């Protein structure tokens, strides 16, 4: 598998506070319980790695958890008392850490690589690399996140949540995730993931 999580659309945001990585390290102590020391080794596959992730992307996710735009009961509690400066410091700290290497499933690598680099033009699925870079390194200035090395289970769950939002799936156990919209149009990741099959999501 290529451990790829496709990201949010580019949206203008208020100017972020300048982050202090040293201050962020002290503030990150509670985060380590789930995401591991330095954010490199989460306790479970459905928790994301944070080490080396783009600073602006991390801050944006914390802001979205706090506002309720991105829903997660655990994270909502964790960010409830964070200030903008706290979030900036945490973003700076985790962005300064060395990302860890993920494990690849050889049965899915070839298909995942083709989809990531070339998409599925017959079905209108764009290449992930167009936004996330040829090696999944992300594009910090646009808040497209680092994808290389991310936990496969987390990637798969997030893509399915984007897909559920894009297709407006119904059901008591359906988990949806949305990202920023362009006017009245659905957000980029909902639109992209809605075109993906289960096998394509697993491969990517």
Regions found by a protein language model. Name each.
Residues 13-28, 38-46, 95-122:
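Electrostatic cytochrome c docking/interface patches
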Residues 1-16:
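Gram-negative bacterial Sec-dependent N-terminal signal peptides
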Residues 42-49, 64-107, 140-146, 163-203:
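Axial heme c-ligation environment in periplasmic c-type cytochrome domains
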Residues 21, 25-67:
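The feature marks the first
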Residues 23-32, 55, 117-129, 144, ...:
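Sequence context surrounding c-type heme c attachment/ligation sites in exported
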Residues 29-37, 90, 125-134, 204:
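The canonical Cys-X-X-Cys-His
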Residues 34-40, 51, 95-96, 131-137:
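Detector for the c-type heme attachment site
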């Amino acid at each position: 598998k290529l451990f790829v999580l496709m990201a949010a659309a580019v949206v203008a945001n208020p100017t972020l506070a300048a982050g202090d990585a040293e201050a962020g390290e002290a503030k990150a102590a509670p985060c380590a319980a789930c995401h591991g020391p330095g954010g490199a080794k989460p306790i479970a596959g459905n928790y994301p790695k944070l080490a080396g992730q783009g600073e602006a992307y991390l801050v944006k996710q914390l802001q979205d958890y706090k506002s309720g735009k991105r829903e997660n009961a655990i994270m909502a509690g964790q960010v409830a008392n964070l200030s903008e400066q706290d979030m900036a410091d945490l973003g700076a700290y985790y962005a300064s850490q060395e990302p860890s290497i993920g494990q690849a499933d050889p049965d899915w690598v070839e298909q995942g690589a083709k989809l990531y680099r070339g998409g599925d033009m017959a079905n209108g699925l764009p290449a992930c690399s167009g936004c996330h870079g040829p090696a999944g390194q992300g594009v910090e200035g646009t808040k497209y996140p680092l994808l290389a090395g991310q936990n496969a289970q987390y990637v798969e769950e997030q893509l399915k949540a984007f897909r559920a939002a894009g297709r407006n799936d119904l059901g008591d156990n359906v988990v949806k995730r949305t990202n920023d919209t362009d006017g009245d149009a659905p957000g980029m990741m909902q639109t992209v993931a809605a075109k993906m099959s289960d096998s394509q999501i697993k491969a990517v």
